[in-house]
């Protein structure tokens, strides 16, 4: 089955074709980051307009790369939530209209299920059950995965997501959007012996929930103190970026290890935009070796929003009997736990 995947939940237009027999055939990603950077974040109206403008041309490019015609597609999968309503509507409308014209099924896919399954596109794959850390600008969750659609939430952020905390911290020291890659780049110039240290929120108590608002406040306090004392130079910013990144990474690693031990599992996947962070990957690999556990992740280009993960997730549900929806349905908010389980046939 050859499935066209459309991802338009936020500020990336991702298009891909996944073949259940031959794997990923082609993919393209168009990022709107440059347009939104001047506003310091995503502007929903601009995002939806750009998805409308770019989706059809990208579909043509992906078909050409795969050496296919539209008539050779067997199904279309599109992101139907969670995300920005206008952006979701753009992709869903195009996807369903094209499917109707071709006489093939169209299936709405959960954005975070796409992220969760993205590491399955790689040669090295975990076997279910495993623990998933979903970490992005909008989500920070630990989930036990027993099968496709068999998800149990173990913990989540009670306030800011990790990616959102990176964005806000970056803005405090004058770095552009998106903040995660900017903080990571600047942190490489930081001095680990600067004396700056930020809290690892909620790691001193039981449980698997996260909170990053206090860490963000501690960072802001340090920045204001540096400004008041005329110390907020480039080296201070680099030191602060390193201390902040280290605090976020340590918090995520501690909770991941705790989740694996609590559930008696030895496999972890990390997915979502923050999973591309090199320090996070290195620390997870180092710490999980101590408990003889393994970590899996997607290649960097599939950590951020992309069509490949949507095509793959849609294909898994379609080949295992899930039928296309009769009407257009998108959801700005959509808990993973509400997805139906799907046993492999």
Swiss-Prot record:
GO biological process, any: tRNA threonylcarbamoyladenosine modification
Cofactor note: Binds 1 Fe(2+) ion per subunit.
Binding-site residues for substrate, renumbered to this chain: 134-138, 167, 180, 277
Alphabetic keyword roster: Acyltransferase, Cytoplasm, Iron, Metal-binding, Transferase, tRNA processing
Chief place where the protein resides: cytoplasm
Cofactor: Fe(2+)
Catalytic activity: L-threonylcarbamoyladenylate + adenosine(37) in tRNA = N(6)-L-threonylcarbamoyladenosine(37) in tRNA + AMP + H(+)
Binding, Fe cation: 111, 115, 305
EC number: 2.3.1.234
GO molecular function terms listed in the Swiss-Prot or TrEMBL record: iron ion binding; N(6)-L-threonylcarbamoyladenine synthase activity
PANTHER family: TRNA N6-ADENOSINE THREONYLCARBAMOYLTRANSFERASE, TRNA N6-ADENOSINE THREONYLCARBAMOYLTRANSFERASE, MITOCHONDRIAL
Family affiliation: Belongs to the KAE1 / TsaD family.
Protein name: tRNA N6-adenosine threonylcarbamoyltransferase
Higher taxonomy: Bacteria, Pseudomonadati, Pseudomonadota, Gammaproteobacteria, Oceanospirillales
